[in-house]
């Protein structure tokens, strides 16, 4: 890769690795030991995608999302998924104004920059569908009128894998709309001790200051879209996605939408790492979070505890990565 030594992202105010490091350092102050998750959130934002977090309660998903929004000076709203949550509670409603004798649109929380949908699978399919339009079309339609969401826009939805009673599992079509899926996980003993000492008396979230802006995010997105992908790396990504459709134990493989999600994600990941070109290692790093949740496992594989992430790891072992100089 010697020919790429000078092929780095050009840094300016609010761009480049230093800007990303500043955002990650902010998140480290609020949530200890979760830098990899924070990097995935940042990659999803740069790639114009949404994130699904499947994890137990109490592992700082809300804190991380709030800190992420505060660090980027973005508006933030949290929606709690419940069976009685209506589409209007998400996208907004038209309210009659007696002063003008007309209906006025009252925006819902989904028109914020960063939206946390907690326990999305507790919302009814009808409400999930309303959210789906926002995620895919980046707009909402209320009483025949269309309203664009704020940009940059990202939805971070959570699911609790333990309590599944009274839930409405997300259909495959909606899972496919999430660019990435990840878990936060419990902290290590050392991290939990550090958290107790640092957060037991004061909350750094209350004093967090922005280190970037919505304009910076827009710049990141435009620059990441120009990151080069060599044809052999493109072929490698297509081979990985196609292999998920042929592996035993997988009832439904990744769709062509997954191929597009993968190339957007690896471009963003390379950009976050200060490169204007993609390496096969970028593809390997992003394959599980991008593809794992899109696979529908066969019943016998599920009984054995086999997951989509496990299947993607097997695919990575089977499909050879390019080794020639890019």
Where are these regions (language model features)?
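C-terminal engagement/docking regions of AAA+ P-loop ATPases
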Residues: 8-11, 246-326
């Amino acid at each position: 890769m010697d020919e790429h030594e000078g092929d780095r992202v050009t840094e300016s105010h609010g761009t480049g690795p230093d800007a990303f490091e500043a955002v990650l350092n902010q998140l480290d102050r609020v949530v200890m030991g979760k830098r990899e998750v924070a990097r995935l959130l940042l990659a999803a934002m740069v790639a114009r995608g949404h994130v699904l977090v499947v994890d137990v309660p109490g592992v700082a998903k809300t804190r991380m999302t709030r800190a992420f929004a505060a660090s980027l000076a973005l508006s933030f709203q949290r929606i709690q998924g419940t069976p009685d949550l209506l589409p209007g509670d998400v996208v907004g409603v038209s309210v009659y104004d007696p002063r003008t004798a007309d209906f006025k649109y009252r925006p819902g929380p989904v028109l914020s920059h960063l939206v946390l949908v907690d326990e999305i699978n507790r919302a009814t399919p009808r409400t999930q569908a309303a959210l789906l339009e926002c995620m895919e079309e980046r707009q909402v339609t209320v009483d025949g009128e269309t309203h664009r969401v704020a940009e940059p826009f990202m939805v971070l939805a959570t699911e609790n894998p333990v309590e599944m009673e009274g839930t409405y599992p997300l259909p495959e079509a909606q899972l496919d709309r999430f660019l990435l899926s990840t878990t936060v996980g419990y902290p290590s003993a050392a991290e939990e001790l550090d958290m107790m000492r640092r957060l037991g008396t004061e909350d750094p979230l209350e004093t967090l200051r922005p280190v970037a802006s919505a304009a910076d995010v827009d710049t990141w997105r435009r620059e990441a879209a120009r990151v080069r992908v060599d044809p052999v790396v493109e072929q490698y990504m297509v081979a990985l996605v196609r292999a998920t459709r042929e592996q035993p134990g997988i009832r439904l493989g990744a769709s062509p939408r997954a191929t597009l999600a993968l190339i957007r994600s690896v471009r963003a990941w390379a950009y976050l790492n200060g490169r204007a070109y993609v390496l096969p290692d970028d593809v390997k790093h992003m394959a599980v979070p991008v593809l794992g949740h899109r696979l529908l496992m066969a019943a016998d594989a599920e009984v054995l505890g086999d997951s989509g992430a496990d299947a993607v790891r097997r695919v990575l072992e089977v499909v050879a990565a390019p080794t020639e100089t890019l």
